[in-house]
């Protein structure tokens, strides 16, 4: 509401031309507001088109696990997701995922957006931040990197392999930033979102409205079952960058092929 000290101007006589102008201005603002809302609400198709080929299904085989996910071979653990990642290349064989997806794996298979399958191996792991880097001969387009310093309420989408059904997209907003001490990992810096995230989505991409990576899907808050409650977390791009920098400094990661 405008300051009340100026409200007296509202009672002044209004000539007809000004009244007509005011009416048209009101209509114009309403129309542009609707278009703006539609633009923000309908970013999902463009976000998907810009990024989905950079997101893969990750099928880890865990010892002694007898409940495979949808379409997975016997002995396969609940599926996860991964993201083709590189600093300076358009095409890469490096895949980011959540460490808890692959930590126990005796074998890892990835499936790209075209349905091609290949073996991947663990290249480096940061258990404290729950980040792992896989390497595979099945290269793919490195996802474009965004900025995780998004205003609260910004539109974002999550792409991942929910319930092992294959990659899908869900959209929502940034609910909070810099969430820490949640209890998932030793070192945390999460983006909280209400975009639907379910088991199998871990390691998938949280993307902005332009389809650029802003976080790596990591966990959900739920009480009684693995059901999305709208309180979901992605590792921030800043924390991912810190993790990869430490991996490089320690010599475990990763020389990109020129």
PLM regions: where:
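Short beta->alpha transition motifs characteristic of CBS
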Residues: 97-103, 175-176, 199, 215-222, ...
């Amino acid at each position: 509401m405008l300051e009340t000290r100026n409200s007296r101007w509202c009672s002044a006589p209004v000539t007809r031309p000004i009244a007509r102008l005011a009416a048209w201005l009101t209509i114009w603002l309403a129309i542009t507001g609707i278009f703006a809302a539609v633009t923000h609400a309908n970013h999902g198709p463009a976000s998907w088109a810009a990024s989905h080929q950079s997101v893969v299904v990750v099928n880890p085989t865990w010892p002694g696990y007898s409940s495979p996910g949808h379409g997975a071979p016997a002995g396969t653990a609940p599926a996860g997701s991964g993201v083709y990642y590189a600093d300076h290349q358009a095409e890469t064989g490096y895949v980011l995922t959540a460490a808890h997806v692959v930590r126990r794996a005796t074998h890892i298979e990835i499936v790209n957006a075209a349905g091609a399958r290949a073996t991947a191996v663990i290249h480096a792991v940061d258990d404290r931040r729950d980040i792992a880097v896989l390497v595979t001969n099945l290269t793919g387009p490195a996802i474009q990197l965004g900025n995780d310093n998004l205003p609260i309420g910004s539109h974002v989408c999550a792409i991942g392999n929910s319930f092992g059904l294959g990659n899908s997209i869900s959209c929502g907003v940034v609910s909070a930033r810099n969430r820490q001490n949640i209890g998932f990992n030793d070192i945390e810096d999460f983006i909280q979102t209400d975009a639907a995230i379910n088991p199998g989505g871990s390691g998938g991409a949280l993307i902005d409205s332009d389809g650029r990576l802003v976080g790596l899907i990591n966990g959900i808050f739920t009480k009684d079952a693995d059901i999305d409650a709208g309180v979901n977390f992605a590792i921030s791009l800043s924390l991912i960058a810190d993790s990869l920098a430490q991996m490089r400094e320690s010599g475990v990661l990763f020389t990109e092929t020129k």
